[in-house]
């Protein structure tokens, strides 16, 4: 490609920028120079190096800045398993599949570390609430929530072979621990709260329709609990709802068939 696409720039500027964005920054010094360096590390998928620059070389003031936090969140997202362009491209290419399978399938054959998605989301929360962040930032948060769910399900439920094959290998009702299902609950909450910032052109019409459907179904069953992003607020009924959704064939990666009747979802896990 003639112009190198920068991952973080793409993430927060909706694919409108290339390397020329940083031309003038390359001549700057101090914190701005370190920001530029960290940006380059993220573009090269050297996430630990980017994190090291942001957390050890920037001044305290710069570390608390929006740009530094965006880069830091992108770095942790990368460690979780997210390549923004690759992931959204795979979502856009999905023509079929249930909601949770759509989220999980891009991580088949990929090493995943869901805990770093949690750290990335915590970092974005430091920038501000959903109401105070920009649309682009909220779109990134929604994607991080989706990636948290996808990496969690692939890592916790699709365990054979070692990097998964797209099918669940554990009993989704009892074989996924509370701590593990909490990743799915929290990821769902972030996706749900920020989903309006995502366009169908970014994630594809089928993925958009499918994910919107599972958001609506969860809201019908559990109301505002489907937007929980604080682990301390998670209750047993919320975990049950998410387990039920994941166990269904229509929304999840399980075998329980509802025939399209959402009233049957709560019976997926007895």
Language-model features, listed with the residues they occupy:
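C-terminal motif of bacterial Sec signal peptides marking the signal peptidase cleavage site
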Residues: 13-16
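Short coil/linker segments at helix-helix boundaries
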Residues: 22-36, 48, 52, 78-134, ...
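The tetratricopeptide repeat
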Residues: 33, 68, 75, 137-150
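Short, conserved catalytic or interaction motifs in soluble domains
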Residues: 19
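Short, charge-rich amphipathic alpha-helical segments embedded
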Residues: 53-85
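Short, low-complexity, Pro/Ser/Thr/Gly-rich segments in the mature regions of secreted, periplasmic
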Residues: 251-270
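Sec-dependent signal peptide recognition
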Residues: 2-8
């Amino acid at each position: 490609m003639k112009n190198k696409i920068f991952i973080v720039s793409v993430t927060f500027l909706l694919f409108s920028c290339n390397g020329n964005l940083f031309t003038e920054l390359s001549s700057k010094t101090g914190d701005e120079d370190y920001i530029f360096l960290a940006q380059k590390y993220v573009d090269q998928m050297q996430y630990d190096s980017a994190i090291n620059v942001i957390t050890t070389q920037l001044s305290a003031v710069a570390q608390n800045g929006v740009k530094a936090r965006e880069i830091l969140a992108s770095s942790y997202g990368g460690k979780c398993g997210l390549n923004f362009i690759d992931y959204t491209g795979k979502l856009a290419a999905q023509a079929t599949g249930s909601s949770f399978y759509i989220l999980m399938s891009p991580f088949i054959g990929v090493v995943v570390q869901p805990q770093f998605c949690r750290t990335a989301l915590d970092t974005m929360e430091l920038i501000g609430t959903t109401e105070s962040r920009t649309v682009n930032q909220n779109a990134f948060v929604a994607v991080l929530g989706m990636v948290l769910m996808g990496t969690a399900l692939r890592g916790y439920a699709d365990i054979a072979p070692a990097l998964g094959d797209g099918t669940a290998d554990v009993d989704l009702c009892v074989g996924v621990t509370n701590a593990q299902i909490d990743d799915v609950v929290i990821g769902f909450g972030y996706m749900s709260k920020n989903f309006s910032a995502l366009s169908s052109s970014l994630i594809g019409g089928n993925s958009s329709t499918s994910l919107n459907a599972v958001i609506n179904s969860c809201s019908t069953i559990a109301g505002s609990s489907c937007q929980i992003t604080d682990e301390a607020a998670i209750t047993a009924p919320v975990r049950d709802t998410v387990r039920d959704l994941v166990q269904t064939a229509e929304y999840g990666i399980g075998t329980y068939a509802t025939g399209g009747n959402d009233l049957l979802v709560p019976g997926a896990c007895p």
